[in-house]
Amino acid sequence: MWNPEENDSIEDAAASARSLNELLDLMYLSFEKMSPPQTERLLGFALNISSDISVWMDKEEKRREKQHY
């Protein structure tokens, strides 16, 4: 799994964003068929992915701010 602390590549961040989108789309299409524990695990996974993307965005914003000063 991608770690934003170790890999600052935009390609990896974009791949994580696509994975999150696909996971949420699949969950939306299958929501009524999933058991509550399965839903809970997948939501946890989605939250982890979104957190990774958020960390990367924060670091990228700080990096870009340093370039302008």
Regions found by a protein language model. Give the residues of each.
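Sequence/structural signature of long amphipathic alpha-helices
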Residues: M1-Y69
